[in-house]
């Protein structure tokens, strides 16, 4: 990594930090506000980087790092811009006695004209997070409402203007915001709520910009054996696998209890099937009719089915261009003897390294329906043609016999001429 230190729009050090090791965790979950976290171990041979004051070189009062990921001779990628949140120097102190003519220390342990000089060497552990933390810290002092006529694409950039530039992908739709909308305290959560109205999400780009994007879309990369794949792991858990949704409310007229429920009637999780009965309960005083209760139960069921996924833990060669939220395809060898391809969304990324980058680990959520379909396919079959190789003994069916054994002394002499 190449890491530059900035504060207040000015470069603090003329040279990049000497990074001994580093790690990164990027999370793209629905409820995550600050998605990227990084840790660095920085060499400090002169002992000058360990912070004492809040505005020292690696101090926590607004110091930012511009992180560039260099990939051998293949160029470089602006990985991110992050803000330092913690620093911890680990120092080694040495001392020596030097001549200092005229130096007299009363009751000192050294003779006159001698002085002890200390030198400090250190490594500094630095933790940092992406720039959304500034928006998360900048809470509203009083309730805020959008201006009349505001839309998703006008209000979100306005809320975040003090902290970063917002860039919308071309496929992000726009929508008007209700005039009665009120935001209190949490600025970043208000931004999340605004984007959720059109099904969009945000993530921070390599130049410190906020990218607003739509989940889904076409895969941007295929990872498979002999093409970057190191390993694939997966696991299953029965936790949270519901098959019935029961919604409760109260009649507006007399306060009597309302109950409505829907079940899964087919598939491996069907109600009263081998999985058993696993109901989920939801109660709200806002539900005042059976129709409302039933409609919400259907919604909960559909949301569950849409979220049902197989999570793959994928290790690959260094991939600095990948971001949480990207769609990729993972090629997995299966027991049938071929590779199947599972499309999925990256929900988290882990990277790290020392003097060189190490493998990238990504967690990929693959929709259960896509996995079920992929397991029934044979992708290699599309490469079958009617072209056949030359017919030689080694390609003949076994029923044709085998090449007879011939020794040199059985070959006629004129064949050797």
PLM regions and their residue ranges:
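Short aromatic-glycine-enriched beta-strand elements
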Residues: 360-362
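Amphipathic, non-transmembrane alpha-helical segments in extracytoplasmic/periplasmic proteins
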Residues: 33, 40, 128, 143-168, ...
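Glycine-centered loop/turn motifs
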Residues: 60-64, 149, 184, 226, ...
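Assembly/oligomerization scaffold segments
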Residues: 1-146, 193-199, 203-204, 213, ...
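Surface-exposed aromatic
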Residues: 172-181, 309-310
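Acidic, small/polar-enriched beta strand-loop surface segments
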Residues: 1-13, 192, 196, 206, ...
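SH3/SH3-like beta-barrel fold
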Residues: 364-366
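Exposed loop/turn and edge beta-strand positions of beta-sandwich/beta-sheet ligand-binding modules
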Residues: 78, 122, 241, 340, ...
């Amino acid at each position: 990594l190449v890491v530059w230190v900035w504060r207040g729009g000015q470069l603090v050090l003329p040279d990049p930090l000497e990074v001994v090791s580093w790690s990164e965790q990027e999370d793209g979950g629905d409820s995550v506000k600050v998605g990227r976290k990084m840790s660095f171990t920085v060499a400090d041979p002169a002992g000058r980087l360990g912070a004492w004051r809040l505005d020292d070189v690696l101090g926590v009062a607004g110091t930012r790092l511009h992180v560039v990921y260099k990939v051998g001779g293949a160029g470089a990628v602006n990985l991110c811009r992050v803000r330092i949140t913690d620093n911890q120097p680990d120092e080694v102190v040495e001392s020596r006695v030097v001549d200092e003519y005229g130096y007299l220390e009363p009751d000192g342990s050294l003779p006159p004209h001698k002085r002890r000089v200390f030198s400090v060497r250190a490594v500094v552990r630095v933790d940092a997070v992406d720039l959304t933390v500034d928006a998360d810290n900048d809470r509203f002092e009083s309730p805020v409402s959008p201006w009349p006529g505001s839309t998703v694409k006008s209000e979100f950039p306005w809320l975040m203007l003090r902290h970063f530039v917002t860039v919308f992908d071309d496929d992000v739709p726009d929508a008007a915001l209700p005039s009665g909308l009120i935001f209190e305290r949490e600025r970043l959560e208000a931004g999340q709520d605004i984007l959720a109205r059109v099904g969009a999400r945000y993530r921070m780009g390599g130049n410190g910009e906020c990218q607003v994007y739509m989940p889904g879309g076409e895969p941007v990369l295929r990872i498979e054996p002999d093409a970057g794949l190191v390993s694939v792991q997966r696991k299953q858990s029965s936790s949270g696998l519901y098959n019935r949704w029961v919604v409760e409310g109260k009649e507006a007229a007399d306060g009597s209890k309302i109950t409505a429920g829907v079940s899964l009637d087919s598939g491996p999780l069907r109600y009263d099937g081998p999985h058993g009965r696993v109901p989920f309960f939801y109660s709200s005083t806002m539900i005042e009719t059976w129709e409302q209760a039933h409609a919400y139960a259907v919604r909960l069921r559909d949301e569950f089915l849409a979220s049902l996924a197989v999570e793959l833990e994928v290790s690959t060669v260094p991939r600095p261009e990948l971001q949480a939220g990207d769609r990729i395809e993972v090629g997995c060898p299966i027991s049938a003897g071929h590779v199947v391809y599972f499309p999925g969304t990256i929900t988290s990324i882990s990277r790290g390294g020392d003097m060189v980058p190490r493998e990238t680990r990504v967690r990929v959520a693959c929709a259960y329906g896509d996995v079920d379909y992929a397991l029934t396919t044979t992708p290699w079959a599309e490469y079958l043609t009617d072209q056949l190789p030359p017919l030689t003994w080694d390609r003949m069916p076994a029923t044709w016999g085998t090449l007879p054994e011939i020794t040199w002394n059985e070959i006629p002499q004129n064949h050797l001429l």
